[in-house]
Amino acid sequence: MNKFKGNKVVLIGNGAVGSSYAFSLVNQSIVDELVIIDLDTEKVRGDVMDLKHATPYSPTTVRVKAGEYSDCHDADLVVICAGAAQKPGETRLDLVSKNLKIFKSIVGEVMASKFDGIFLVATNPVDILVYATWKFSGLPKERVIGSGTILDSARFRLLLSEAFDVAPRSVDAQIIGEHGDTELPVWSHANIAGQPLKTLLEQRPEGKAQIEQIFVQTRDAAYDIIQAKGATYYGVAMGLARITEAIFRNEDAVLTVSALLEGEYDEEDVYIGVPAVINRNGIRNVVEIPLNDEEQSKFAHSAKTLKDIMAEAEELK
């Protein structure tokens, strides 16, 4: 860990997601030092200059520079946004083989620097790539985190807040499972401004069809955005910044991230989106929400989908 300086993040991958995350960190002054690594060194040079020019208006000064893998040796957090991008019509799981090869190289380079901090992975398919990062790095599971369903849960809360005309922060509802097509909403524990969703729906019979559509919109949002503008990046960048903030401020915040399960939710040896307590040490523990039978069945299906894909991946054997 970075014992002698302020909080240091090394960002690997300066594409749309990575550069949006970098801007979020600087804009909110979440870090003291940000190092950016990418094969496109000229774009990194330009972004570093641009971000530096923004720092006079950030709450506190953030040091930003272009770097190399050797800069990871004293980093508190290495965030990986590098990898092949998702194309229109392509699922996140289609990206597996391409990105596993990329990650084996990246994680090897990071660990060669004597890195001893926390990994945060955003590249898709995130649940599989964070599992690969854990395997390739040899770090404890607590210090390898995936962005998981943090963005899906944010989309879900936003749409529910609009349906019930309250602020998103007044909605407590989670999307869990794979960050992808098999994810599921935890309807049984959703509440709006402290009122159980089930109770509210009893007062609005027409609302059941509406909330089912809300989940479909949540699940398919990425495809809609990719079709419209080629990629999603602002939402996930803010989600990554939120996880980073929870780590550096030692918040013990509960966020829906991709964490390794070891018996929780009746699953083993799979990274998947679940609520977890996040603090300076990474994942303190997984929060096990009691699911109803339907939710448990869907969660098991989601986990099996990921396990089946990993079983076919030569890089993980």
From Swiss-Prot:
One of the record's GO cellular component terms: cytoplasm
Coiled coil (residue ranges): none
Gene Ontology terms: biological process: glycolytic process; lactate metabolic process
Protein name as it appears in the record: L-lactate dehydrogenase 1
GO molecular function (one): L-lactate dehydrogenase activity
Residues binding NAD(+), per UniProt: 17, 38, 43, 69, 83-84, 105, 122-124, 147
Entry keywords, A to Z: Cytoplasm, NAD, Oxidoreductase, Phosphoprotein, Stress response
Organism of derivation: Staphylococcus aureus (strain bovine RF122 / ET3-1)
Short name of one Pfam family: Ldh_1_C
Residues engaged in binding substrate: 86, 92, 124-127, 152-155, 232
UniProt cross-references to InterPro entries, sorted A to Z: L-lactate/malate_DH, L-lactate_DH, L-lactate_DH_AS, Lactate/malate_DH_C, Lactate/malate_DH_N, Lactate_DH/Glyco_Ohase_4_C, NAD(P)-bd_dom_sf
The gene coding this protein: ldh1
